[in-house]
Amino acid sequence: MKPNIHPEYVTTEVTCSCGNTFTTRSTAKGGSIHVETCSACHPFYTGKQRVLDTAGRVAKFQQKYAKVQAKKGK
């Protein structure tokens, strides 16, 4: 490997929005990373399902295809 071209590989603290923190190593500057989901709160790892924006998607779908249903009903 060439000397003096690789970024510094330092200990970094990762903080999740759920409050969970853990330490890893990274080339990120500042020594800390903030994430929205981690293995402690992600539905895949916890086994609990969370609905994020289903209501908005359903409403958007119904608005989009309401005209089609009205034409079929006539």
UniProtKB/Swiss-Prot annotation:
InterPro entries assigned: Ribosomal_bL28/bL31-like_sf, Ribosomal_bL31, Ribosomal_bL31_A, Ribosomal_bL31_sf
Cofactor entry: Zn(2+)
GO CC term (a single one): ribosome
Single GO MF descriptor: structural constituent of ribosome
Entry binding sites for Zn(2+): C16, C18, C38, C41
Cofactor binding note: Binds 1 zinc ion per subunit.
Pfam families listed in its UniProt record: Ribosomal_L31 (PF01197)
Source species, domain of life: Bacteria
GO biological-process terms attached to the record: translation
Key words, A-Z: Metal-binding, Ribonucleoprotein, Ribosomal protein, RNA-binding, rRNA-binding, Zinc
PANTHER family reported in the protein's UniProt record: 50S RIBOSOMAL PROTEIN L31, CHLOROPLASTIC (PTHR33280), LARGE RIBOSOMAL SUBUNIT PROTEIN BL31C (PTHR33280:SF1)
Similarity field: Belongs to the bacterial ribosomal protein bL31 family. Type A subfamily.
Protein name (Swiss-Prot/TrEMBL): Large ribosomal subunit protein bL31
